[in-house]
Amino acid sequence: MHLTADDKKHIKAIWPSVAAHGDKYGGEALHRMFMCAPKTKTYFPDFDFSEHSKHILAHGKKVSDALNEACNHLDNIAGCLSKLSDLHAYDLRVDPGNFPLLAHQILVVVAIHFPKQFDPATHKALDKFLVSVSNVLTSKYR
């Protein structure tokens, strides 16, 4: 999905605020995904799924760190996330349908914590960004 200059501007404007709370917001998005789509728990057999567990926060930080990298490479998301795509496709074999589920929850979390900044243009830009990330992470499945 092509990100326009305007999309990139909106992403770069809000993402540092999100990144500053990476483990918390990433964990919150994961927790929401696990609660709304329980089938996604199958990849985490030893997790404590309670909202603020060390497992949720640690994996939330991993998600946030990957999104930070993608945000820092908006012109080359595929190159920047290639190894992560390999990991999810070949080693972890994560259901590619899970990435849009998490992307949706990330949008929800950003909207909750940044209601003034989450205007329609920012919503559109972040949605396109997360779709781009999801597309990269599922590209090796084909």
Swiss-Prot record:
Paired cysteines (S-S): none
GO molecular function: heme binding; metal ion binding; oxygen binding; oxygen carrier activity
Organism: Xenopus tropicalis (Western clawed frog)
Keyword match Membrane: no
Organ and tissue specificity: Red blood cells.
Superkingdom in the source lineage: Eukaryota
Keywords annotated in UniProt: Heme, Iron, Metal-binding, Oxygen transport, Transport
Function: Involved in oxygen transport from the lung to the various peripheral tissues.
Segments forming domain Globin: 2-142
Subunit and partners: Heterotetramer of two alpha chains and two beta chains.
Name under which the protein is recorded: Hemoglobin subunit alpha
PANTHER family in the record: HEMOGLOBIN FAMILY MEMBER, HEMOGLOBIN SUBUNIT ALPHA
GO CC annotation: hemoglobin complex
InterPro entries linked to this entry: Globin, Globin-like_sf, Globin/Proto, Hemoglobin_a-typ, Hemoglobin_oxygen_transport
